[in-house]
Amino acid sequence: MTPQISLIIPAHNEAEFLPACIDAARTAADRIDSAIEIIVVLNRCHDDTEAIALRHGCRIVREDAKNLSMIRNAGAAAATGEIIVTCDADSRMHPNTFREVIRRLRQGKVVGGGAMVLPERWSLGIIASGVSILPYLAFTGVSFGLFWCERRDFEAIGGFDTRFVSVEDVDFARRLKAHGRKSGRSWGTLIWQPLITSCRKFDQFGDWYLLRNPSFVRKVFRGTDRQAADHFWYDVRSD
């Protein structure tokens, strides 16, 4: 059966988190009548990520570039579903995610969207960090964490921009939103189907790290600072 939804999961040494991510997706898939495929894009993995993905019935794609845009695009290029969904391996989607994505896209009023993101744990530092980016979220008018759209719209905007080594998701969301506006479709956010994400960045760097290092945050949000991106994403869990 040709899948209706292709879920793309970038994975760099994700043996710890990948099983829960896949299990959550399977639970969501059980609530729809359509088939799905899960594509795990292996990126420089030397742990059990590949074995775990295969054991869970996922398709495997390889992309070793230290560039999340290229990693996500590699998964999309291999996808066969008419709907593209992508989320990170350390996140767990809501059981009704796929059902709501299909419902909204069938209505034809939205071009795609994101989801509300909730941390797996709370602290004052994590809350303050979240509050600090609210103005940015308000300015962009998009949501992040988990992205969903029809394949035709993904391809129409050229997927993720490979010039970005960080905040590629923000750029993608803004371009997809602008693309939808041309045909009278808006950006959608899954408010009642939130994404639960790990706090491993806070665990590693500290709950107050982002607020105490505003210059670093500016470099990350610039999108093209290789050193900052490697420090925070690509060279993490590489030992």
Q: Where in the sequence are the language-model features?
A:
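Short beta-strand/loop segment that forms part of the nucleotide-sugar
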Residues: 34-44, 61
